[in-house]
Regions:
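Long, contiguous interaction/recruitment modules in multidomain scaffold/adaptor proteins
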Residues: 1-84, 106-109, 113-119
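Generic helix N-cap/helix-start motif at coil->alpha-helix transitions
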Residues: 8-9, 53-58, 71, 85-92, ...
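Conserved small-residue packing positions in alpha-helical repeats and bundles
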Residues: 62-66, 95, 130, 166, ...
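TPR-repeat structural position
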Residues: 71, 88, 104-105, 139, ...
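Alpha-helical adaptor scaffolds
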Residues: 96, 100, 112-188, 193
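TPR/TPR-like alpha-solenoid helical repeat scaffolds
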Residues: 131-132, 159-171, 199-206, 227-247
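TPR/TPR-like (Sel1-like) alpha-helical repeat modules
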Residues: 186-189, 203-225
């Protein structure tokens, strides 16, 4: 027998034993059985490496791999947790997973159901509800929720929430307010999305010179940034490059 095939069998068996002993999902056995070295590599990255190096980077990689193999896994787990125990924490978890999977209706129901009693004005819950409403194509309701959040929690700060507010007023058609909000949120926003959206709105309003300045700033900033940042922001950087070429 070829040494390569023999090594593959040994690794598959070792990973299979790990699946059974550690209580991993049984679908891993079928993946390991049919996909040889590729399956072993994926299993190592998704299930073994996080245990060896329980850092945020490892967890992020593992989650990406699991999302490709079984995209609904975390949401199903959150559903089960809520069925077993209807707690505020479990509602938040399922609401967040529903948002992540684009199930905005379910997320909105969970957030609305959680906004009561001591949590009636919880800023994180209100922001989650606004995100769900915006995802359902309800920018006015999202803006109303964000306005209520601001009124109830004047000291609350969230860059993502601020960007969402800018997007809601833009979608409603309040261009002047949207420009004002985008101009404010781009200051210190951790990424290029806010700047790209600001540039696109400036372009639509006819301010091509200012839009070009924003897109150039994005390209200059990203060129001087670390490689990981360029990878994470690749889509927004490419949008800025294309839009600048059209001006």
């Amino acid at each position: 027998m070829s040494p390569i095939i023999l090594l593959s069998i040994v690794l598959q068996i070792a990973c299979g034993v790990h699946v059974v002993r550690t209580g991993r999902p049984m679908y891993w056995l079928f993946i390991l059985l049919f996909f040889s070295y590729i399956a072993v590599l994926i299993y190592f990255i998704a299930e073994i490496l996080p245990d060896m190096r329980n850092g945020p980077g490892s967890r992020k990689v593992a989650r990406k791999v699991r999302d490709v193999i079984d995209p609904g896994r975390d949401k199903r787990r959150a559903e089960i947790n809520l069925q077993l125990s209807d707690t505020q924490a479990n509602r938040r978890e399922l609401a967040a997973e529903s948002l992540r999977h684009g199930d905005y209706q379910r997320a909105a129901e969970l957030y609305q159901g959680s906004l009561k009693g001591l949590y009636a004005t919880d800023p994180d819950l209100m922001l989650g509800l606004a995100r769900a409403q915006f995802g359902m194509g309800q920018p006015q309701q999202a803006r109303d929720t964000l306005d209520a959040l601001i009124a109830a929690n004047p000291d609350f700060r969230s860059k993502e929430g601020h960007l969402l507010y800018a997007r809601t007023v833009e979608d409603i058609g309040d261009v002047a307010a949207a420009l004002h909000e985008y101009e404010a949120v781009v200051q210190g926003y951790p990424g290029e999305e806010a700047r790209v959206r600001y540039g696109l709105l400036l372009k639509r309003t006819g301010d091509s010179r200012r839009a070009a300045d924003i897109f150039r700033e994005i390209l200059t900033r990203s060129a001087a940034s670390p490689k990981y940042y360029q990878r994470e922001q690749r889509d927004w950087i490419e949008t800025a490059r294309q839009e600048l070429s059209r001006l």
